[in-house]
Amino acid sequence: MIQVLLVTICLAVFPYQGSSIILESGNVNDYEVVYPRKVTALPKGAVQQKYEDAMQYEFKVNGEPVVLHLEKNKELFSEDYSETHYSPDGREITTYPLVEDHCYYHGRIENDADSTASISACNGLKGHFKLQGEMYLIEPLELSDSEAHAVYKYENVEKEDEAPKMCGVTQNWESHEPIKKASQSNLPPEQEELLKRYIELVVVADHRMYTIYDGDKTEISSIIYEIVNILTQIFRPLHIRVALIGLEIWSSGELSKVTLSADDTLEAFGEWRETVLMNRKRHDHAQLLTGMIFSGTIEGRTYKSRMCDPKHSVGIVRDHRTRRHFVANRMAHELGHNLGIDHDRDSCSCGANSCIMSATVSNEPSSQFSDCSLNQYLKHIIHYHYTTCLYNEPSKTDIVSPPVCGNYYTEVGEDCDCGPPANCQNPCCDAATCKVTTGSQCAEGLCCDQCKFMKEGTVCRVARGDWNNDICTGQSAECPNKGYYG
């Protein structure tokens, strides 16, 4: 049984609360200074991990008490995760770092169903959390008192004074039919199963980025970890699991052409991916994170509906140094296009000022896809087989840390995971144990109906094009994916 660590944060506010200060995210006009004080409650004799699997923080925001639940993001790395950089003479150096005890977490605020959190606990607490619809950031203050942290609203960060930033993908709605609003949280179980995809992602930092960060490979890696930690959370409502399978730093020079033209840079990166990266690293999609400032206020570029294509399952995104959430938003946007999702129309909404697939990049980035994006994903993406490379779920043993019941991800030793007991809506799953309820055979899967295995011969995935029907076996809740042509 995973022990939950209880950590209490005591808040103390300096007299200069409300004054301006330069923090990692930029110039902040209003902030609170807090002192996290850790109080552990591990059982006697328990082994103390460097970074616990589950943590709980209690603190106050604007004078109101909140409880922040954090769980280690076990979807961040895969077992065959590797990192590659290059010696000054261009020699490839690949390592397989131990990532079991990493320090990147997802979380939620107790009694706030719409809350989210993405936190790095590597050196203090750094990241963001959404509380009562507002985005807050937290980060350590660089003071002699190392325990001091700043908490502030995203809206209090001074915005860049420049022309509106744009996505490089041209609007191309395939249908002029009215968009039917769709909920991201109330899909029937069989539809949730049909939507599941698994993106094994490689992120490449170009030589310009390497130079900007003074050749600090450790810092660059940490930045990419933070970005992908946010990215995995963004895609969860679409039932897409993003796992970082590789990280590459072009430390000796650019390995594909990087220019002011986003189109030329994208094309060159796609060619490099097809001819070089695909031959030495198994993955589904690659993103180039670059220090180049593209012409025309372009922030990113990708190919529309080309996921799984050897040359075109790629994207490029401009780095913004300390604005991790902004970069994660852009990477999610380009991934969305590569999956086939269009820009949002004016009528689309996600409960925020802007959504992931907005054509214009907001200075206050969203972490949510709109109802239109989900509707298009439901209506189009699941009906085509060009994303077949995303069907192969990484082995549950690939995510190399012990299971935690209640994190929505079914891990080794679990039959199901419908989240915390207060949030679980699956009558076939016992949220307290992550086992099927008494009398149930299953709790999830395309071949599971009302907690029972569907009969042998039942079609669980209808043939499209030249593909055959997939058929239930009667012995399992999983829908076999034969993956062959008829």
Curated annotation (Swiss-Prot):
Transmembrane segments: none annotated. The active site is at residue 334. The modification Pyrrolidone carboxylic acid is found at residue 191. The keyword Zinc applies. Residues 1-20 form the signal peptide. Pfam families: Disintegrin (PF00200), Pep_M12B_propep (PF01562), Reprolysin (PF01421). Expressed by the venom gland. SMART domains: DISIN. Disulfide bonds join 308-389, 348-372, 350-355, 405-424, 416-434, 418-429, 428-451, 442-448, 447-472, 460-479. Residues 402-486 form the Disintegrin domain. Residues 21-190 form a propeptide. Its cofactor is Zn(2+). Zn(2+) binds at residues 333, 337, 343. A motif (Cell attachment site) lies at residues 464-466. Binds 1 zinc ion per subunit. Ca(2+) binds at residues 200, 284, 389, 392. It comes from the Eukaryota. It is found in: Secreted. Coiled coil: none annotated. GO terms for biological process: proteolysis. Residues 197-394 form the Peptidase M12B domain. Belongs to the venom metalloproteinase (M12B) family. P-II subfamily. P-IIb sub-subfamily. The disintegrin belongs to the long disintegrin subfamily. Monomer. This is Zinc metalloproteinase-disintegrin VMP-II. It comes from Crotalus atrox (Western diamondback rattlesnake). The lineage of its organism: Eukaryota, Metazoa, Chordata, Craniata, Vertebrata.
